């Protein structure tokens, strides 16, 4: 059986959920290898299927002066080393159709950024790699849009797709998480993932001393969104994790501290075990009789 189909079936059958986790961006080979080692150790303790995440390029940074990563060539070499050294699947994002083919040679899951979730050419190019496609819901999109995005992948010949909630714009410089989306996105007929870290971004919400703005975030609310997501019954959790969030070069305010990863996962597993969120409630509307 095709490796992508095998992994996709494994993720669909994950109990209680699968995990996409890692630092936001590749900072160095040494750092990424160390993070992968620790995250795999923790996820293995709980028997949670892990897909290690990191980006080779942050193409939509608020400022052109901001750190973006090592680039596609060096970044993919590092991710491939992680994949081989720790025997874990990899997820990373693409920003242009031309990136899909080389990324598909390394990554097991190709992620479509939220800002690009409706870009047909990008979705089709990603789909044609045959890899699993994780589509993040645009901050500007209704959940129903994700059914169309997933269908674009399927019509390109790839049934291995999943969709990811990452918050909705709530005025300027803020996002809100609507738990109803986690249910409505099931209309896409594929696994639903909750991004519990980016959902708490405050885009361009932090003024810099030297002028300009950067994205802030509400890290302290990550457990709240995570608890809600597993109670609702999502199939997967996406979270960015860092060993030193205050000094992370990208999205530090929304990266979860590595030292608290085990503690949070333990709680989320306990919540998911008692929740019936993955089963629809059978509502009886016939008249009540004494």
UniProtKB/Swiss-Prot annotation:
Its main location: cytoplasm. It is found in: Cytoplasm. One of its GO terms (molecular function) is 3-deoxy-8-phosphooctulonate synthase activity. Belongs to the KdsA family. NCBIfam families: KDO8P_synth, PRK05198.1. GO terms for cellular component: cytoplasm. InterPro entries: Aldolase_TIM, DAHP1/KDSA, KDO8P_synthase. It comes from Pisum sativum. Its EC number is 2.5.1.55. This is 2-dehydro-3-deoxyphosphooctonate aldolase. Keywords: Cytoplasm, Transferase. Disulfide bonds: none annotated. GO terms for biological process: biosynthetic process. It catalyses: D-arabinose 5-phosphate + phosphoenolpyruvate + H2O = 3-deoxy-alpha-D-manno-2-octulosonate-8-phosphate + phosphate. It holds the Pfam family DAHP_synth_1. It comes from the Eukaryota.
């Amino acid at each position: 059986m095709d490796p992508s189909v095998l992994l996709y079936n494994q993720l669909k059958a994950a109990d209680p959920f699968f995990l996409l986790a890692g630092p936001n961006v590749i900072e160095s080979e040494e750092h990424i290898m160390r993070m992968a080692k620790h995250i795999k150790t923790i996820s293995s303790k709980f028997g949670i299927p892990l897909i290690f995440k990191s980006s080779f390029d942050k193409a939509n940074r608020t400022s052109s002066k901001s750190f973006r990563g090592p680039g596609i060539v060096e970044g993919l070499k590092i991710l491939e080393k992680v994949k081989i050294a720790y025997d874990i699947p990899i997820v990373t994002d693409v920003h242009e159709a031309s990136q899909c083919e080389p990324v598909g040679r390394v990554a097991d899951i190709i992620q479509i950024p939220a800002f690009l979730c409706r870009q047909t050419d990008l979705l089709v190019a990603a789909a044609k790699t045959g890899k699993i496609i994780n589509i993040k819901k645009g901050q500007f999109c209704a959940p129903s849009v994700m059914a169309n995005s997933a269908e674009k992948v399927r019509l390109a010949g790839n049934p291995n797709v999943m969709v990811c909630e990452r918050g909705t714009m709530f005025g300027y410089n803020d996002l809100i998480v609507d738990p109803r989306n986690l249910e409505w996105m099931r209309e896409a007929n594929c696994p639903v993932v909750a991004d519990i870290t980016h959902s708490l971004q405050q885009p361009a919400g932090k003024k810099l001393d030297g002028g300009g703005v950067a994205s802030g975030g509400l890290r302290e609310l990550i457990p709240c969104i995570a608890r809600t997501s597993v109670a609702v019954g999502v199939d997967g959790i996406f979270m960015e994790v860092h060993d030193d969030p205050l000094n992370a070069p990208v999205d530090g305010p929304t990266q979860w501290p590595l030292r608290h990863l085990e503690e949070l996962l333990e709680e989320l597993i306990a919540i998911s075990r008692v929740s019936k969120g993955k089963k629809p409630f059978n509502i009886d509307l016939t008249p009540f009789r004494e």
